[in-house]
A protein has these predicted regions:
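The feature captures the beta-strand-to-loop junction immediately N-terminal to the Walker
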Residues: 68-69
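Short catalytic/signature loops enriched in Gly
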Residues: 4, 8-23, 36-43, 48, ...
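Helix-to-loop junction immediately C-terminal to a conserved catalytic motif
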Residues: 83
Length: 362
């Protein structure tokens, strides 16, 4: 690379041109297992945590893919696999046409400019010993993106983009509110002009009163900068607002993926149905009329997941085939709506004696 800082900045802004609608990221059979070892002097693997198990999807430039599911279903682990914070246990990950599945840290360096993360906790993700200007400037310095003056100009520009001002550059994280800290995290993620931003539950640690501000900021930035998002959350109301498509995860697997509105209007997988039944409805009359599906029991252990369909111990539609044969993601309904279920809701299968109770929402 040239030693001229101005040239370095120009090189940073260039990269493979992916037109809106073209595939930016493709995941095929991704797996991430965490070994459980036992022993003192000689440790041996006695079990594995199946955190992400055979996950496949593609993401097109300019779209937002929402990723939802209960706590512990593997959403955040999948995000860290995509960003290559974690090494993969198996599968193939392609970004901008390049296979990055087994790339070394050095080989990943140019990829990280185009793939950034916004983390869940704005309190823990910012170094309390650094001033805000230095935090946002870190990616620029690491990637040699200009001289000192160019970096300072870029930092001030980023602060203004996320709704802060130049006067905040010398303050420390503890001097900001939770919403402002998350804006700083967004500014840091945007520093290198990425193509893909993975937002890992970016509003779950914030007060309800300021969640909408951060969501609207991310929405506006996508329109202005042409960003592509993977938006992770457990709040399906939030995901519906920001997503073009939504993938539902359960115990390390994607069980349904669909255009956002169709998922909410016509869910196919029983787990999705249960999640949607728990979403609050602002109209008290409608809320009183609809049914809430209460899943009994806890999520099974990812160390020893159930055979067949992983959801069958809690599913009110489960039959014998669900216990022995694992369902595959299959096209259901319109193009792009896939679900992994032996008894999809569209078939209208009457539920047998169930592992769940159905109660009228109060």
């Amino acid at each position: 690379m040239t030693d001229d800082p101005g040239t370095q900045m120009a090189v940073l802004e260039e990269g493979p041109e992916i037109e809106p609608g073209q595939v930016l990221l493709q995941a095929e059979h991704l797996r991430k297992y965490f070994p459980i070892k036992h022993g003192v002097l000689i440790q041996r693997e006695v079990a594995r945590v199946h955190a992400v198990d055979d996950v496949s999807f593609e993401l097109r430039a300019g779209e937002t893919l929402g990723l939802v599911g209960e706590s512990g279903c593997g959403k955040s682990t999948l995000a860290r696999c995509i960003s290559r914070i974690y090494d993969l246990s198996g599968g193939t990950l392609t970004f901008e046409g390049r296979d990055i599945s087994r790339s070394s840290r050095r080989q990943l360096r140019p990829v990280r400019r185009d793939l950034q993360m916004v983390f869940q906790d704005p309190y823990a993700s910012l170094n309390p010993r650094k001033r805000v200007g230095a935090i946002i400037a870190d990616p620029l310095r690491i990637h040699h993106a200009g001289n000192r003056e160019q970096i300072r100009t870029r930092v001030i520009e980023l602060l203004e983009v996320v709704g802060l001002s130049a006067e905040h550059v010398n303050r420390y994280p503890h001097e900001f509110s939770g919403g402002q800290r998350q804006r700083i995290g967004v500014a840091r993620a945007l520093a290198l002009r990425p193509k893909l931003v993975i937002a890992d539950e970016p509003v779950s640690a914030l007060d309800v009163s300021i969640r909408a501000q951060v969501i609207n900021l991310l929405d506006d930035l996508q329109d202005d900068l042409g960003l592509t998002y993977i938006f992770i959350a457990h709040d399906l109301g939030v995901v519906r607002h920001v997503s073009d498509r939504i993938a539902v995860m359960y115990l390390g697997k994607i069980v349904e993926i669909s255009p956002a509105e169709e998922l909410y209007e016509r869910p196919v997988h029983p787990y999705t149905e249960a999640l949607l039944s728990a979403v609050p409805v602002p109209d008290p009359d409608l809320s009183a009329q609809r049914q809430q599906i209460v899943l009994e029991g806890d999520v099974p252990s990812p160390i020893s997941p159930p055979s067949g369909c992983r959801f069958h111990p809690r599913c009110r539609y489960a039959t014998d085939i669900c216990k022995v044969e694992e369902p595959q993601l299959t096209l259901r309904g319109s193009a792009g709506h896939l679900a992994a279920c032996h008894h999809p809701l569209s078939v209208g299968t009457a539920p047998p004696e169930s592992a769940a109770a159905v109660v009228t929402g109060q």
